[in-house]
Amino acid sequence: MEGVQRYFKLDRSRQDDFLYPLIFQEYIYALSYDHGLNRSILLENVGYDNKSSLLIVKRLITRMYQQNHLIFSDSNQNPFFGHNKNFYSQMISEGFGVIVEIPFSLRLVSSLEGKEIAKSHNLRSIHSIFPFLEDKFPHLKYVSDILIPHPIHLEILVQALRYWVKDASSLHLLRFFLHEYHNWNSMITPKKSISIFSKRNQRFFLFLYNFHVCEYDSIFIFIRNQSYHLRSTSYGALLGRIFFYGKIEHFVEVFANDFQTILWLFKNPFMHYVRYQGKSILASKGAPLLMNKWKYYLVNFWQCHFYVWSQPVRIHINQLSKHSLDFLGYLSSVRLNPSVVRSQMLENAFIIDNAIKKFDTIVPIIPIIGSLAKARFCNALGHPISKPSWADSSDYDIIDRFVRICRNISHYHSGSSKKKNLYRIKYILRLSCARTLARKHKSTVRAFLKRLGSEFLEEFLTEEEQALSLILPRVSSTSRSLYRGRFWYFDIICINDLANHE
C-alpha cells in the first residue's frame, strides 16, 4: 500500500486517479499472490503453480485490443485465451482486483485520518452482529428475509464504478475482460462464481458484487436514517460518494412526491436493518402494515434506482416468535422461556406465570453434515469415513489438518446456544481422522485409538475448552454453565466455508 500511495503522490495536482499504469507493475501481482496465501480458509491454502510475468500481461492486454480475437465461442478452448485461459483469467482478475480496490482503500484511510473510532477493529468481526441481535430482536415482532437481487447486466456495475474510478482506460479494460465471459449472472452471484472460478480467482468478481451491495446500502441507509426519530451513528465511518445527493434527488423525482412526505410514511423508531453479503434482515416492532410499506418501497427502490427486477411476493414477512432466521451459518430465533414465580403475602399465595423472550442461536446440523459429506469427511447420513487423499501425508500433517478444521468450526460456532450439534460435528471429524490414520497404517480404528490414548482426543479440544478445563473443575455447576454458554469473538472476518451452505 505504501508503494501505491507513493504512485499517487507523484501527481497531486491532478484529481483523477489513473490506475491503468499499475497493471504493468509486477508488485501488484505480488500483492494479489500474498493476499491469497494469507487468506484464512477452511481447508488448505491453494498453492500458486505459475509465476506472474510482466511480458505475459503486456502481451495479453495487446491481444485484448485486437478485434479479431474477440470471438465468442461455447467451446472450452476459447480463442481469446487459448490453452492458457485459466491462467490468464486468474492473473488478470487477481491483479485487476487489487488495482480497483486501491481508490477505495486510499479514500478509507484519508477519511479515517484525525478520527478516533474506539475499537473499530472489533466491528469487523461477523460475531459483532449477534450481540446486536440479542439486544434488539427479543423486543421486535416481525421480520423479513431479503435477498438483494443482482444486476441483470454487468454494464450497470461498470457505470456505477465510474463514480469511483475515473480512469477511462481501466474501465475499457474492465469491459473487455467482462465481455469475454458468457454467463454474466453466474459471475455476479457469489455462490455460482465458486463453481466457475477457482478459490483464488474470485476476488475481483466478489469485489464487484460487494461494491453493488455497498451502493445499495449507502443510499438505503441514508433514506432510512432520514425517516427515523433516532438517527443511526454506526454508519458514520463509511465513505461518501460522488454525486450522492444528486442521485437521491433523482430517486425522489421517480416517486413524484415530496421527499418528506414519503419519509413520513415510514417513521418508526423500532425498525432495524442487518445485512451480510447478499442477504439482509429487516425487523420491526410495528404493525404488519408498516412492514408491507417497506417491502413495496424496497422493490421500487431496486427497480427505479438500480434497474434490477424483484417481485414483492419473494419478500416474506414473518412473526419472530414463529420463524427461524438462517443467517451467517446459524439458525436464529426468538423463543419464550417460561418461568413460574410463587409469591407469598401473609396468608395468601400467588403463582405468577412469566415468559421471558430469549434470542436463541443453534448450529444447523443437516446442512453442515451435507458440507462435510461433500468434502468427503462422512457419508450423506453423517457416518465418518476416511480421507484417502490425505493418507500419503505424515501422521502429524493429517492430525494437524483435522484439528485446524475442527477448531475453525468450533471457533466460528462458539455462539451456539445448544452444543449438542457442535459435539456431533467434532465427533465426525475426530473419527474421520482416526479412520484416515488407520487406513494409512493398515490397522483398525479401535487398535489405533488404543495405542494413542487420550492424547489424540485432547488435540481436538479448542483453546477455550482447554483454558476452562485448567481454570475450573468440570464437576462444578459454574464450569458446566460456561461450557454451555455462548462465546462471541471479535477476530472472525469471514464466514466459515462449511457454514456458508446457502
From Swiss-Prot:
InterPro entries: Domain_X, Maturase_MatK, Maturase_MatK_N. GO terms for biological process: mRNA processing; RNA splicing; tRNA processing. Transmembrane segments: none annotated. It is found in: Plastid, Chloroplast. Keywords: Chloroplast, mRNA processing, Plastid, RNA-binding, tRNA processing. GO terms for molecular function: RNA binding. Pfam families: Intron_maturas2, MatK_N. GO terms for cellular component: chloroplast. PANTHER family: MATURASE K (PTHR34811:SF1). Usually encoded in the trnK tRNA gene intron. Probably assists in splicing its own and other chloroplast group II introns. Belongs to the intron maturase 2 family. MatK subfamily. This is Maturase K. It comes from Vitis vinifera.
